[in-house]
């Protein structure tokens, strides 16, 4: 494995899905998270604590996106991260033999074949690989689909226990939800993936 420095300055290891470690047990919330908690006053004068949304990281490469998910688990921030990926799905790259000039104008959300292949890719590859990289169980349920003349957006959510017992989650205060949005458009085969892991307070 080769190590390289990420934009944040930390060392990262090249992604190999066969060597991703499982997250066996939860740990206490990182102390650095306290800087993301703020207090707000409600209309009735009561103070409540609110966690700021996690900062968004943008990617244009599937392996880098998956590597980020793995690194967040290594850094114990798996329940507080936001990643956005814009990419050509592997089934498109295979069909055009990695030559973007060969992309056909019909390769977009208006093509039933494209949507079918994309849904297969999401369920059988993207979600599976994200789970492998995270090291914990992801059980996404489809919670909606919105189609407009220019876009199709699928929304998925996981509010489960991620493979940990309620007692272990309670011991460390680690309850979190996962949200996944996948969007394609009517102009080209570029796909956008938005992944959020946020604590449930």
Swiss-Prot record:
InterPro entries, A to Z: RGI1, RGI1_sf
Membrane topology (UniProt): Peripheral membrane protein
Protein origin, superkingdom: Eukaryota
Primary residence: membrane
Pfam families the record matches: RGI1
Task of the protein: Involved in the control of energetic metabolism and significantly contribute to cell fitness, especially under respiratory growth conditions.
Entry similarity comment: Belongs to the RGI1 family.
Protein name listed in UniProt: Respiratory growth induced protein 1
């Amino acid at each position: 494995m080769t190590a390289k420095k990420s934009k944040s300055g930390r060392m990262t290891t090249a992604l190999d899905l066969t060597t991703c470690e499982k997250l066996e047990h939860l740990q206490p919330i990182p102390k650095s998270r306290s800087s993301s908690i703020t207090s707000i006053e409600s209309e009735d004068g009561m103070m409540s604590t609110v966690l700021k949304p996690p900062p968004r990281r943008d990617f244009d490469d599937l392996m880098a996106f998956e590597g980020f998910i793995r690194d967040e688990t290594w850094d114990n921030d798996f329940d507080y991260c936001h990643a956005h990926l814009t990419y050509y799905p592997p089934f498109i790259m295979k069909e055009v033999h990695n030559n973007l000039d060969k992309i056909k104008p019909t390769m977009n959300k208006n093509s039933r074949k494209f949507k079918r292949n994309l849904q297969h890719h999401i369920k059988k590859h993207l979600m599976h690989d994200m789970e492998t990289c995270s090291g914990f169980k992801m059980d996404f349920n489809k919670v909606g689909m919105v189609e407009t003349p220019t876009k199709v957006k699928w929304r998925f959510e996981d509010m489960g226990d991620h493979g940990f017992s309620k007692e272990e989650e309670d011991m460390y205060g680690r309850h979190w939800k996962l949200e996944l949005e996948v969007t394609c458009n009517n102009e080209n085969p570029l796909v956008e993936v938005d992944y959020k892991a946020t604590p449930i307070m």
